[in-house]
C-alpha cells in the first residue's frame, strides 16, 4: 500500500499516438506491472491515449481501408507485442500477428505464413491486441483509469510546477481541451509534411490550369483515387511500394481482374480491363521499380552467412578505431560476403556455368581463398575475382551488385520501345529469381546485403557509426542500394505491373526524369530515352501527376500543428549529424538522448518528462518505419519493442 499521502497522488501518463508503437508501450507497461511484487507499494496510474484514429490500428492500419493495400512483410514477420522476443517477458495479452492470424483465419482473410497480409488485416490484429491489452490494464490494481481520447494533440508545453500540459482538438472539430500529465510519450507515426519547393511549384501550376490535378506525397489509403477519370493519362512519380498500392486501386479497385496464365514467372498473369482504368505512366530516378522479394521462409534467407562481416571482425574494427565507417570498414567486408553468397549458390545450383560440378567447386575454393586474403578494398577484390572468373566462365561478367540496383546508370535508349523492352526483360528475370528463392545466386547476394543492412541498423542505434559515414555513405548510396534490391513488394505485385503493361495500360518514362507544366498539361521527360524521330528526349504528357511516396519522415518538414509548435517554441529540437568537415547537418528526427529516448529542447536540456518512440527517432536510428520482428532481439531486429520496454520502465520508475 502507499506509504504517504503524497504517494497516493495518481501519476498521469499520456501516449500521444495510439498506433502500433503506442500499443507497444502499454503492452510493455502491462508486462512490467504483471511481473512486479504484489506487496510492493505503488502510486496509482491514470493512463491516457490520444489519437484522432482508433487506438490500435491508428491511421495507417485502420480497418475501413481497401483490402488491396498490402503490407510489405509476410505474416511471420511483424508484431506489436513481445512474442517470443528474447529478453522480454510477454504480458498476458501479448500476441504476434502470425499467432493471431492462425487462430483467426476468417478475420485474416486466410492469409498464410509466407504471404503478405492486407493492411486492413493487420489493423484487425492491432484492434484485437489493443482490446486485450486495455482490458488487462483496466483490471490491474495499479491502474486507476485508462482513457482514450479521439482527438489530435496540437501543442505540448511544460507546466511551471512540473510535468506537461497538452492541448487537444477533438475529431468533431471542437478544440481547447487541455490535458495535464506527469509524463508524455510521443509515438506520432507518419506525419503531414510540407511540399518541397519543386512540388509546391507543380501544385501551384496545376491549380492555375483547368483540368490539371496534382496529388502530393500521401498515405495511399488517405487518397480518394476515384477522382481520377477513366482514360486519363496519369504520371506517377516513384516506383516504390506506394506505386504498387496505387496501381492496385486504379485497376482492381475499378473492377479489373488478373487471371493466371500458367506461364513462367514474369508472365504469370493476364489483365482483363474493366474499361474504367486510366493510363499509367511511371517514372523514377533509376527507371525501374523496386524488385520483388525472394520467396523464402525467413526475413533473411536461412542459407545466407556473413563470414567476413562477423561479430569478431566488427569488434576488432571497433577496438582499433572506436567507431565504424561504412565505406572504409564495413563495405569491404560486406561486399565480400555478397560475392561469396552469390557464387556459393551458383556452384550449388548452376555448376555448369562454371564448367561442371568439379570445376565449380575448384573455382569456389580459389575464390574463397582470394576473399579470405584481408587488406583489399572492394574494387581490388572485384578485379582479382573477375580475373579468376574469366578462367572458368569467359562469357560471364563478375557480379556488380551496385549495377543491379541502378542498371541503366550508363545506358541510353534510342526509343521508348527500346527502353520498355529492357524493363520488361529485367522484371521478368527478377520474377524468375524471386521464385527460385534460396536457389537464386542473385537473391542470395541480395539476402547477404539485407543481412548487412540489419547489422548496420543496430550499429547506428548503438552509436557505433560515425555521423559523417551516415551522411556520405548510408544516406548517399547504401540506403538507395539496399532499398531498391531488398525492400520491394511480393512477386505478384511485379507480375501485375507486367500484366498491365502487356494490356496497354502502363508504361515507364525513363531514368532521372524531369517534370514541367506546359499547354498540354504535365510533361515528363527522361534524358536517357530518345523519341521515335531522333528529335530529342521522348516526352509523355498527362492531366494528373501523382507523387507515389509517403510524406517525408523529417521533423523539420512536418506541417502538423504539434510538430510546428514543438520546434518553433524550442520544446523540441531537430537532431544534428556532424559531416566530414565538422559542420552540423540537420538529421531527420528529433534531438533525443539514448534509450529511453528523452526529448531534448532547443537549449540542449534534457526533458525528463517527454519520451520519443518510432519514426521521429530517425536522427539516432535508421529504418524507423519498419515494425518489430517477432522472435528477434529487442536490441536489433525488434528495436522498437526494446525502445518501448525502456520507456515503460522509465515511466514506472516514477511510481
Where do the language-model regions lie?
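Flavin (primarily FAD) cofactor-binding/catalytic cores of flavoenzymes
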Residues: 1-63, 108-654
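Redox-cofactor-proximal catalytic regions of oxidoreductases
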Residues: 50-108
Amino acid at each position: 500500500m502507499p506509504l504517504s499521502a503524497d504517494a497516493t497522488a495518481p501519476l498521469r501518463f499520456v501516449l500521444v499516438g495510439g498506433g502500433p508503437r503506442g500499443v507497444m508501450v502499454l503492452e510493455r507497461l502491462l508486462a512490467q506491472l504483471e511481473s512486479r511484487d504484489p506487496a510492493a507499494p505503488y502510486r496509482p496510474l491514470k493512463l491516457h491515449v490520444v489519437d484522432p484514429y482508433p487506438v490500435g490500428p491508428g491511421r495507417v492500419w485502420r480497418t475501413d481501408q481497401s483490402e488491396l493495400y498490402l503490407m510489405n512483410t509476410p505474416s511471420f514477420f511483424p508484431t506489436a507485442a513481445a512474442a517470443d522476443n528474447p529478453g522480454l517477458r510477454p504480458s498476458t495479452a501479448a500476441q504476434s500477428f502470425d499467432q493471431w492470424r492462425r487462430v483467426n483465419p476468417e478475420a485474416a482473410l486466410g492469409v498464410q505464413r509466407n504471404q503478405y497480409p492486407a493492411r486492413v488485416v493487420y489493423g484487425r490484429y492491432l484492434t484485437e491486441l489493443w482490446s486485450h491489452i486495455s482490458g488487462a490494464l483496466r483490471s490491474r490494481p495499479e491502474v486507476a483509469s485508462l482513457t482514450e481520447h479521439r482527438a489530435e494533440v496540437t501543442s505540448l508545453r511544460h507546466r511551471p510546477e512540473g510535468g506537461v500540459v497538452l492541448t487537444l482538438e477533438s475529431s468533431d472539430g471542437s478544440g481547447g481541451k487541455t490535458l495535464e500529465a506527469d509524463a508524455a510519450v510521443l509515438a506520432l507515426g507518419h506525419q503531414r509534411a510540407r511540399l518541397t519547393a519543386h512540388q509546391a511549384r507543380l501544385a501551384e501550376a496545376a491549380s492555375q490550369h483547368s483540368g490539371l490535378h496534382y496529388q502530393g506525397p500521401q498515405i495511399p489509403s488517405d487518397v480518394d483515387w476515384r477522382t481520377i477519370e477513366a482514360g486519363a493519362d496519369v504520371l506517377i512519380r516513384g516506383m516504390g511500394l506506394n506505386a504498387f498500392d496505387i496501381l492496385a486501386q486504379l485497376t482492381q479497385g475499378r473492377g479489373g481482374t488478373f487471371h493466371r496464365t500458367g506461364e513462367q514467372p514474369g508472365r504469370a498473369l493476364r489483365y482483363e480491363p474493366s474499361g474504367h482504368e486510366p493510363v499509367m505512366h511511371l517514372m523514377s530516378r533509376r527507371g525501374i521499380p523496386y524488385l520483388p522479394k525472394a520467396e523464402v521462409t525467413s526475413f533473411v534467407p536461412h542459407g545466407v552467412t556473413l563470414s567476413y562481416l562477423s561479430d569478431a571482425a566488427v569488434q576488432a574494427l571497433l577496438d582499433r578505431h572506436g567507431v565504424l565507417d561504412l565505406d572504409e570498414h564495413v563495405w569491404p567486408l560486406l561486399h565480400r560476403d555478397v560475392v561469396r553468397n552469390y557464387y556459393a549458390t551458383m556452384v550449388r545450383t548452376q555448376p555448369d556455368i562454371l564448367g561442371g560440378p568439379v570445376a565449380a567447386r575448384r573455382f569456389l575454393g580459389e575464390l574463397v581463398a582470394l576473399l579470405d586474403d584481408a587488406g583489399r578494398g572492394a574494387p581490388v577484390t572485384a578485379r582479382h575475382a573477375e580475373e579468376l572468373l574469366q578462367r572458368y566462365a569467359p562469357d560471364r561478367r563478375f557480379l556488380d551488385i551496385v549495377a543491379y540496383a541502378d542498371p541503366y546508370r550508363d545506358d541510353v535508349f534510342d526509343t521508348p520501345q527500346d527502353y520498355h523492352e529492357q524493363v520488361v526483360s529485367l522484371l521478368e528475370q527478377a520474377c524468375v529469381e524471386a521464385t527460385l528463392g534460396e536457389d537464386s545466386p542473385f537473391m542470395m547476394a541480395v539476402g547477404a546485403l539485407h543481412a548487412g543492412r540489419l547489422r548496420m541498423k543496430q550499429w547506428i542505434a548503438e552509436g557505433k557509426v560515425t555521423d559523417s559515414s551516415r551522411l556520405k555513405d548510408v544516406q548517399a548510396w547504401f540506403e538507395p542500394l539496399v532499398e531498391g534490391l531488398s525492400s520491394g513488394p511480393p512477386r505478384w505485385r511485379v507480375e501485375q505491373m507486367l500484366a498491365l503493361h502487356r494490356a496497354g495500360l502502363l508504361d515507364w518514362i525513363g531514368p532521372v526524369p524531369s517534370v514541367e507544366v506546359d499547354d498540354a498539361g504535365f510533361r515528363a521527360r527522361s534524358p536517357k530515352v530518345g523519341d521515335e524521330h531522333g528529335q530529342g528526349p521522348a516526352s509523355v504528357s498527362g492531366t494528373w501527376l501523382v507523387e507515389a511516396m509517403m510524406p517525408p519522415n523529417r521533423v523539420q518538414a512536418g506541417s502538423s500543428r504539434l510538430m510546428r509548435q514543438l520546434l518553433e517554441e524550442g520544446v523540441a529540437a531537430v537532431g544534428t549529424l556532424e559531416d566530414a568537415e565538422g559542420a552540423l547537418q540537420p538529421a531527420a528526427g528529433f534531438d533525443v538522448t539514448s534509450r529511453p529516448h528523452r526529448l531534448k529542447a532547443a537549449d540542449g536540456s534534457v526533458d525528463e518528462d517527454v519520451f520519443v518512440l518510432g519514426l521521429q527517432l530517425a536522427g539516432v536510428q535508421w529504418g524507423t518505419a519498419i515494425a518489430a520482428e517477432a522472435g528477434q532481439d529487442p536490441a536489433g531486429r525488434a528495436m522498437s519493442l526494446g525502445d518501448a520496454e525502456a520507456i515503460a520502465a522509465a515511466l514506472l520508475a516514477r511510481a
